[in-house]
């Protein structure tokens, strides 16, 4: 398993131990090297002869080639040092396509959270194959075949295989619930689980859903559960997409209170961010809220409190 997604990721928001047992560099060196790592982008090529699994042709914003040269332009402009790619296809061979696509620049393209058909006879051999590449650091549960009957014995078996290899499970809450994340975390305490996109809440000007807050707090009690502050524009339940930090701050606060500095990471969800605004706009909103926690984090590093 990779030391990349599983090591301490120096990100905008915090240092995520989600992923590691690797020793840290000296404290002085850490604070000097604090960099932004975007842990959630998508890459795909709509010009491939076999087409793409996503996005659909009807998506006028996203249906275009989105490749390394396009993200490099964004990253260079916005000061993003490195990134983790998250699957955008349910086709197993697209994992290899992605790994091949980014092999020319391992310093920027650190890792892939891939897609494998969990709960099937093919899962074990595919996991064995792709996990031999240290950049393949886990999978994402996005689709939910079987509906309410998704969590079969075969699914639990495969989640156990994932945990046994020290890999990470990303979860898109659209088709799953935070309570289900908590159940997986309870049954498989060695499986590192990353909740995507703030916990999946649709953010409006209404009071935040109490049940959602309670579920998130409950899931956070399991130390193998982490949260991505990602896809903030996609979580906005009103249009046009708000650009005021105050609109997102209540959810930021709940996520931060639940998971703290050590179990939150930054992810943009680029290029899906383009549906709501620019990369810089979402980054500035997140930076504006989380900069004080980062200052506290830097101070604790200097004080030798993080080891």
Explain the meaning of each model-derived region:
Residues 1-5:
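Short, small-residue-biased leader/transition segments that mark boundaries at the very start
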Residues 6-10, 18-20, 25, 29-39, ...:
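Mid-to-C-terminal alpha-helical segments outside catalytic/metal-binding sites
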Residues 28-165, 284-287:
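Mid-domain alpha/beta scaffold segments of enzyme catalytic cores
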Residues 38, 84-87, 113, 228-231, ...:
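Short beta-strand segments
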Residues 42, 88-89, 115-119, 141-144, ...:
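Active-site beta-loop-alpha junctions enriched in small/polar residues
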Residues 45-46, 92-95, 148, 202-203, ...:
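Short catalytic/ligand-binding loop motif for oxyanion handling, primarily in non-cytosolic enzymes
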Residues 70, 97-100, 125, 129, ...:
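Alpha-helical elements of Rossmann-like donor-binding domains used by nucleotide-donor carbohydrate transfer enzymes
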Residues 137, 148-265:
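Catalytic pocket-lining loop regions of alpha/beta-barrel enzymes
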């Amino acid at each position: 398993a990779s030391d990349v997604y599983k090591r301490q990721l120096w990100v905008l928001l915090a240092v995520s131990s989600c992923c590691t047992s690797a020793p840290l560099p000296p404290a002085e060196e850490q604070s000097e090297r604090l960099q932004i790592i975007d842990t959630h982008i998508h890459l795909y090529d709509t010009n491939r002869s076999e087409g793409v699994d996503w996005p659909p042709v009807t998506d006028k914003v996203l249906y275009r080639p989105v490749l390394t040269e396009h993200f490099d332009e964004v990253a260079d402009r916005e000061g993003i040092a490195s990134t983790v790619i998250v699957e955008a296809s349910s086709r197993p061979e697209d994992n290899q396509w992605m790994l091949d696509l980014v092999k020319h620049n391992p310093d920027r393209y650190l890792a892939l959270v891939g897609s494998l058909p969990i709960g099937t006879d093919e899962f074990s051999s595919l996991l064995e194959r792709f996990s031999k590449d240290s950049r393949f650091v886990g999978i994402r549960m996005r689709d939910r075949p079987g509906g309410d009957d998704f969590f079969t014995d075969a699914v639990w078996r495969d989640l156990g295989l994932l945990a046994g290899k020290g890999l990470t499970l990303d979860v898109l809450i659209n088709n799953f619930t935070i309570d289900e994340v908590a159940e997986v975390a309870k049954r498989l305490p060695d499986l590192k689980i990353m909740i995507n996109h703030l916990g999946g809440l649709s953010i409006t000007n209404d009071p935040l859903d109490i049940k959602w807050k309670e579920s998130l707090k409950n899931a956070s009690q399991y130390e193998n559960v982490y949260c991505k502050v990602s896809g903030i524009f996609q979580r906005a339940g009103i249009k046009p997409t708000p650009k005021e930090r105050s609109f997102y701050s209540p959810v930021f606060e709940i996520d931060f209170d639940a998971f703290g500095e050590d179990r939150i990471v930054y992810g943009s969800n680029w290029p899906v961010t383009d549906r709501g605004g620019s990369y810089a706009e979402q980054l500035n909103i997140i930076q504006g809220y989380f900069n004080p926690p980062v200052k506290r984090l830097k101070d604790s590093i200097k004080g030798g409190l993080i080891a």
